[in-house]
Amino acid sequence: MKCVISGLKRIRAGLRAKLPTRGGSAAYWTRHMVAMDDWSDSNSSTEHFLWRNAQYPGYIDLMPVSFADGLVVVDYGCGPGNDLVGFSEFSKPDKLIGIDVSPTALATSKKRLALHGKSADLIQIEENRNQIPLESGSVDLVHSSGVLHHAENPGAALSEIYRILKPGGKFQVMVYNYDSLWMHLYVAYVLRIEIGKHDRMPLLDAFRKTTDGPNCPISHCYRPAEFLELVQNYGFQGRFKGAAISLFELELLPKRYAAINSRALPREHREFISRICFNHAGHPIVNDAVAGVDACFEFRKP
């Protein structure tokens, strides 16, 4: 396992030098904010929150927005405010703070929260500095969904998150999962072999082009053990809670037989797919975890 993790790190280091920045992540996410509706009222906003989470069965159980009553909550990488709405509707936090690199996302969050008669402290940070203008030890819960895998310097972000958390404070985070059908069935087989797209570039670079637009400057994926090691290096204690799977991945399941039968598909991917079994919900399991793209973790500051 350590050899595989070390190999992934070396590959990513090489890829980072080739990534198209086009003004950096902040500029990219301002131009390509996560898809949203033109919400007309609080009901349509809440329905969008519920609909979006339903696209990833199991996600909301792994990354809950309830049970945050009386807490100081930070949504790190809040985007257009989906989870800010979730916390404001399904919890009663003492204070709610949204942080993002995109001013457009923060402005959208403000307008969306206003539909609910709610507000939050909204803070723009610089992507290359990652400095959070909050006091050390002032936050109970940091929530970060689908953000750190886009960070140019995730270590700097983790260091700041650790600093602002109170002792015993919680950090719940979702990042893209290498051990997923998205990687082993969609990218490795459907995209590169069936369709013949991105088949001449490194696998991790092909993955990057499939998640948040083909020109997304940074989009890592991690094996759970690799991400645990990364975060624990910054003082956290925690665990891999499990993964949520996308409906898109579930729709691809019938292709698994052709993938296993393909001599063109590297053995790593064939073996991963051949180990699939199913849980009571009908979701594919590999290595005792749902083989979905959203890997979810829970950490605490000692």
Q: What are these regions, as identified by a protein language model?
A:
Residues 81-130:
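Class I SAM-dependent methyltransferase SAM/SAH-binding core
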Residues 143:
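A conserved beta-strand element that flanks and buttresses the S-adenosyl-L-methionine
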Residues 207-208, 219, 224-230, 238-302:
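A C-terminal cap/extension of S-adenosyl-L-methionine-dependent methyltransferases
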Residues 48-71, 86:
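Conserved alpha-helix/loop element of class I SAM-dependent methyltransferases that forms part
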Residues 1-44:
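N-terminal, positively charged/glycine-rich alpha-helical extensions of SAM-dependent methyltransferases
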Residues 155-167:
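A short glycine-rich, Lys/Arg-flanked "PGG" loop and its adjoining helix->strand segment in the class I
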Residues 70-79, 171-200:
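Conserved class I S-adenosyl-L-methionine
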